[in-house]
């Protein structure tokens, strides 16, 4: 890995956190697209979740991605989509039956599947994690 592009850097960070630090994808999303301190200190989170988020912000502060990004990550058994916490880059998700669609714009999804059961734009920093062959 030469770390010449943003994509290489993000891939390296996710690999480090998942493979070396043994963190799950949900926690990785909380590190690279961490909530703001004011949000962490609000009533939005339980005390245990606040402590976890504070720990992540302090220990992995250098891995917070502060610029705009929108990624779709493939892993053994599924996909994760994530965009920056300010939602400077778009991300759209949709479902049709047992299919899940992820794209940067709704028109890309509609080109493949014109009629969907559900379509939404995840909040900034909200991961969409899809596992293959997993029943709801």
Show the residue positions of the predicted features:
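Conserved short alpha-helical segments that host acidic/polar catalytic motifs at enzyme active sites
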Residues: 1-136
């Amino acid at each position: 890995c030469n770390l010449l592009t943003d994509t290489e850097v993000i891939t390296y960070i996710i690999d480090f956190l998942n493979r070396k630090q043994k963190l799950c994808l949900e926690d990785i999303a909380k590190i690279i697209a961490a909530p703001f301190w004011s949000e962490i200190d609000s009533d939005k989170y339980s005390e245990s979740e606040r402590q976890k988020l504070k720990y992540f912000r302090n220990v992995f502060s250098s891995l917070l991605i502060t610029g705009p990004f929108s990624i779709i990550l493939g892993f053994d058994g599924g996909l994760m989509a994530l965009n920056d916490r300010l939602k400077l880059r778009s991300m759209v998700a949709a479902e049709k039956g047992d299919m899940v669609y992820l794209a940067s714009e709704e028109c890309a999804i509609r080109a493949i599947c014109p009629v969907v059961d559900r379509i939404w734009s995840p909040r900034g920093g909200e991961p969409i994690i899809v596992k293959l062959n997993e029943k709801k």
